[in-house]
Amino acid sequence: MAKFIMVVGTSSNSGKTVLVSGICRMLSNKGYKVAPFKSQNMSLNSRVSVEDGEIAVAQYTQAMAARAEPSVHFNPILLKPKGNFVSQVIVHGNPYEDKDYNEYRSKKDDFLVKIKESIDYLDKNYDYVVIEGAGSCCEINLLNDDIANLKVAEIAGADAILVSDIDRGGVFASIYGTVQLLPENWKKLLKGFVINKFRGNIDVLKDGFEKIEELTNIPVIGTIPYDETLVLPEEDSQALDGKRVFGNLKSPIEVNVVKFSKIANFTDVDPFSSDCLMKYIDFNENITGDILILPGTRCSTVEMDLMKKYGMDKKILEFVENGGIVLGICGGYQALGKMLFDEDFSEGDVGTISGLGLFDMETTFGNKKAIKNSTGKISIFNQNFDVSGYELHEGYSVSNETPLISLSKGFGNCGDSYDGSFKMIGDSYIFGTYFHGILENFEFRNYLVNLARSKKNLSKIEDDTYAELFNENMDKLSKIIEENLDFSKIIG
């Protein structure tokens, strides 16, 4: 039998995802078998579980924090927005149907059955399960249909923690208002409050702690200090709204990432951040980097249309003429080809469109989706790298270029034992792959960085700094939580 703990919030971006990650690592460090859980997540940022199913990146990252194999049971319902208020519904890792809100709500009881199946599975296989809520746990206009917050705690028999972000102001009002609006049966599940992102002397909060406990009969069990040095993966593309330049700001190598309108799996580029200066560029901006990334996207044809509209297509071709290094991942890889055929408009309103033409390749879209954990070998210029990644794509590509990866497992371009394409145009290197997570393979990542460094007569890098950075930051987060939160009333 597992002990269930739930983290709910007074609002979106209150710190639920990070807090769950830190608690998972803290409990794992104590020797417990731990699983994260989020009954329903809405995100275009997803990864592939051990069962070859699709789950949100946040739950995948939390699984890494917990040192657990990522499972579809960690995120039984995933909603992937497609536009016009319609989302693709993923159930236990597999595409179910496209539904708008009313259609989805009408199937709520069916989805609750799937959620309960996952809770039962986790109960039998783990010591602790740390549940993450969604948005505010008390949207009173949605309470009857909310299957992502305290309804889940009720089903699982979980003790709940309410977290609120003090950096926004009004933290005590947010906490009190949330508690007052909750139904009595859910209010009783709350065992403590957490104040997140606090700067300064905690003594100034003590009167507030006493007053809020007096008003609610629920204690503040801790305060998490604001720590700008923590480097943690972002949950979804909203985090990019104010994010432009990041990574190693002192690096002589600059990586530009085209900021697609429907960018997906944007964390693919994060492994570059420990060794390179990273910069997101809009369609109308100039390319200033040494390496250009065309990332994943929910709608490849839409992005191709926008690149043509704003002149980014011509800038990319000019970048190649000047010897630049280009990597396209999934939707970005598809855009590097000659044609993208979408006769059924499955990608959006654009339909069939010509691509950048850097690869002699054509992509055709359909309803069948490749969801795979994939492995293979890259063999180029007397270099051999074993690589792994994960595939999440609905198009298949026929390429006449040199394959980038010989597959040992996976679907690849079109189920033909190969993935991706590679070629040189003059002094320019062009790479494309369906492998999300390709840059987590440090040998290939360092190969790309060293290509750019060699063009500037700089020495090679050899270390796997990204993997080290992830675990260092998770352990640091775990320590912050253990030192600043009192979980004795919850985990004993």
Curated annotation (Swiss-Prot):
Please provide the record's keywords in A-Z order: Cobalamin biosynthesis, Glutamine amidotransferase
In alphabetical order, the GO MF annotations are: ABC-type vitamin B12 transporter activity; catalytic activity
* One of the GO biological process terms: cobalamin biosynthetic process
> Pfam families in the record, alphabetically?
CbiA, GATase_3
Q: Which PROSITE patterns match?
A: GATASE_COBBQ
The active site consists of C330 (nucleophile), H436
**Pathway linked to the protein:** Cofactor biosynthesis; adenosylcobalamin biosynthesis
| Coiled-coil boundaries | none
- Intrachain disulfide bonds: none
Question: Key word Zinc-finger present in the record?
Answer: no
Q: Which residues form the GATase cobBQ-type domain?
A: 252-444
Keyword presence, Ribonucleoprotein: no
Source species, domain of life: Archaea
Q: According to its UniProt entry, what is the function of this protein?
A: Catalyzes amidations at positions B, D, E, and G on adenosylcobyrinic A,C-diamide. NH(2) groups are provided by glutamine, and one molecule of ATP is hydrogenolyzed for each amidation.
PANTHER family named among the record's database cross-references: COBYRIC ACID SYNTHASE, DETHIOBIOTIN SYNTHETASE
Which NCBIfam families does this UniProt record tie to the protein? cobQ, PRK00784.1
Report the family membership.
Belongs to the CobB/CobQ family. CobQ subfamily.
For this protein, the record's HAMAP family field holds: CobQ (MF_00028)
- What is the name listed in the Swiss-Prot or TrEMBL entry for this protein? Probable cobyric acid synthase
**Source organism of the structure:** Methanococcus maripaludis (strain DSM 14266 / JCM 13030 / NBRC 101832 / S2 / LL)
Native organism taxonomy: Archaea, Methanobacteriati, Methanobacteriota, Methanomada group, Methanococci
